[in-house]
Amino acid sequence: MNRFNTPVIRCLQYGSITLATSALFACGGGGSSPNGTINGTVAVGAPMQNGAITLVCKNGSANTTTDAGGAFSVTFKFDGPCSITAAGGAITLHSFAPGAGTVNITSLTELLLSYLAAQLGTTVTNLLARLPTNATYQNALTNSTTIANAEAAVATIIKNSYGITLSSSAFLTTAFSVGQGQDKDLDLLMAAGAIDATGKPVATLTTTVTTAGTAAGGGSTGGTQGGGATGGTGGTGTTP
C-alpha cells in the first residue's frame, strides 16, 4: 500500500496538548462542556500521513494531525455533534462525530454525508457549515438509528453498483488500521473506480447515493432555512 506525505499544519488556539509526535491545539466548549476524546483513522486506500484535522462542534473546537498510519486522537471540552475535516496535499475528506469515541474520515464517510445531507434536503457543504448551530442537523447527526440506516443504504448501493461487500456497514465508527478491515474495502473501491485520485467518490456513485438519500427524506427541505430549526433524527458514536 502506498502512502502519501503532507505538511503538518499548525493552528494556534487556546491551550495545547502534545500527543506523541503530533501537535494538538484545542479550544474548550465552555465550563459546562464535558471533556472527551475523538479518535479514528483517515484513509482513501492509503493512510493520510501528517494530515491536518479540524473539528468544529456544537460547543468547542480542536485541531490535530494524523500519524504515519493515518490515525489521530484529540481530547478537549466539547458538546457534539462535530464536523470533521481532514486535509493533506490535494486530498480533503469530511466526516462527523456524534460525540466522543471512534470516528473515521474516509471516502465512505463522504458518501455517508452525501446521503444524510440529501435526506435532510440540503448539501454536504451546508450541513457541515451549519451543524454547530442548526438543531435539525444536530438531531440528525446524533441519532444512532438514522446513522445506521444511512450506512446500510450506502453499503447496499456499493454492493449493487460494484459488487463489493464492505467488511462492516458501521464504517463511521468501526476502528481499523492499515491493511485490514475498512482499509481493504477502500483499496477495492479504488481499484473498481469508485474512488478517484483525490480520494473522493466518483460523481456517478455520489449521485446514486444522493438520490437515495433524497428518497429516504421524502424530499424534505426543512433543515436548510434558519439555524434554529428543529426536527430530524441522527446517530451516536462508539468508543474503540
Identify the residue ranges that each predicted region occupies.
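Bacterial N-terminal signal peptides that target proteins for export
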Residues: 2-15
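N-terminal export signals
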Residues: 16-20, 51
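Feature for extracytoplasmic/surface-facing segments of secreted or surface-associated proteins
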Residues: 28-240
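Generic detector of short alpha-helix boundary/capping microenvironments
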Residues: 15-16, 58
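C-terminal motif of bacterial Sec signal peptides marking the signal peptidase cleavage site
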Residues: 22-26
